[in-house]
UniProtKB/Swiss-Prot annotation:
Protein name (record): Formamidopyrimidine-DNA glycosylase
Species assigned in the record: Listeria monocytogenes serovar 1/2a (strain ATCC BAA-679 / EGD-e)
InterPro entries associated with the record: DNA_glyclase/AP_lyase_DNA-bd, DNA_glyclase_Znf_dom_DNA_BS, Formamido-pyr_DNA_Glyclase, FPG_cat, MutM-like_N-ter, Ribosomal_uS13-like_H2TH, Znf_DNA_glyclase/AP_lyase, Znf_FPG/IleRS
Matching SMART domains: Fapy_DNA_glyco (SM00898), H2TH (SM01232)
Quaternary context: Monomer.
Entries under NCBIfam families matching the protein: fpg, PRK01103.1
Chain positions recorded as DNA binding sites: H92, R111
HAMAP family membership: Fapy_DNA_glycosyl
GO biological-process terms attached to the record: base-excision repair
Role: Involved in base excision repair of DNA damaged by oxidation or by mutagenic agents. Acts as a DNA glycosylase that recognizes and removes damaged bases. Has a preference for oxidized purines, such as 7,8-dihydro-8-oxoguanine (8-oxoG). Has AP (apurinic/apyrimidinic) lyase activity and introduces nicks in the DNA strand. Cleaves the DNA backbone by beta-delta elimination to generate a single-strand break at the site of the removed base with both 3'- and 5'-phosphates.
Superkingdom classification of source: Bacteria
Coiled coil: none
EC number(s) reported in the record: 3.2.2.23, 4.2.99.18
Family: Belongs to the FPG family.
Length: 273
């Protein structure tokens, strides 16, 4: 699933491509992808609207139109591509926004898990999806004090806590593993067992890793590309995720993989305590 660094890079590339484009037709080929609104109403609300800009909140893309905002979640495999109207439509293209300039923004999703919903303009904060999100890791709202308070409140594994979007928005499986490694903390440690120093290390690692991942275009470990079809580069920086049985870059101990609450989880049994 694309995490915050990947979604931010999708946002940035879309922001270069679609503002100013006016929608004259919307085709919904998989109705279940439209949530909170009947698909025909979704289409009716969008025709005639102009895209003014693209924002992001957590793992959600926010398309600001003339009179409304579209919330889009990529889930596991969702991708946006801007194409000419005459280009072949692939079988994995499920939603098409056709523009007056004869281009199309197409939403492709092999697994059909992606979702879209429409809300009042800038009204995403009132939706169930956005209302529950915690602070972004690269904003001033993400503070050590609040983070430590949240961590100390739960007996869940620290990795599980990092994946809780109410604690910090945008961290997923890849970066949670990398954060725990950088902080030298075992991912299965009970969050409320961590010392203040360990919590501070996790906080700092969250900010530094997410910052670098955004700068490098995210991680392409499966099929992720941005909206211009470019691969991420942070996968070349990963130290534990996907490195099962490879030597730790710090100590040489083989990286181990376990299941933690159903998630494949990678760590160094020597460096992380």
């Amino acid at each position: 699933m694309p995490e915050m660094p990947e979604v931010e890079n999708v946002r940035a590339t879309l922001q270069e491509l679609v503002p100013g484009k006016k929608i004259d037709q919307v085709i919904v080929r998989v109705p279940k992808m439209i949530v909170s609104t009947p698909p025909d109403e979704f289409v009716h609300m969008l025709v005639g609207q102009e895209i003014e800009g693209v924002r992001r909140r957590g793992k959600f893309l926010l398309f600001d139109l003339t009179n409304c905002t579209i919330l889009s979640h990529l889930r596991m495999e969702g991708k946006f591509r801007l194409m000419d109207e005459n280009e072949e439509v692939s079988k994995h293209t499920h939603i098409i926004f056709h523009f007056e300039d004869h281009t199309e923004l197409r939403f492709l999703d092999v697994r059909k898990f992606g979702t879209m919903e429409v809300t009042n303009k800038y009204g995403e904060g009132e939706t169930r999806s956005i209302k529950k999100l915690g602070p972004e890791p690269l904003t001033q709202a993400f503070t050590l004090t609040d983070f430590a308070t949240g961590v100390k409140k739960t007996s869940r594994a620290i990795k599980t806590a990092l994946l809780d979007q109410k604690l910090v928005a945008g961290v997923g499986n890849i970066y949670a593993d990398e954060i725990c490694f950088e902080a030298k903390v075992r991912p299965e440690r009970a969050a409320n067992s961590l010392s203040d120093k360990e919590i501070k290390r996790i906080f700092k690692a969250t900010k530094s890793i997410m910052t670098e991942a955004v700068a490098l275009g995210g991680s392409t470990v499966r099929t992720y590309v941005n909206s211009q079809g470019k691969l991420g580069q942070y996968q070349n920086k990963l130290k534990v995720y996907g490195k099962t049985d490879e030597p730790c870059v710090v100590c040489g101990t083989p990286i181990e993989k376990i299941k933690l609450n159903g998630r494949g989880t990678h760590f160094c049994p020597n460096c992380q305590k």
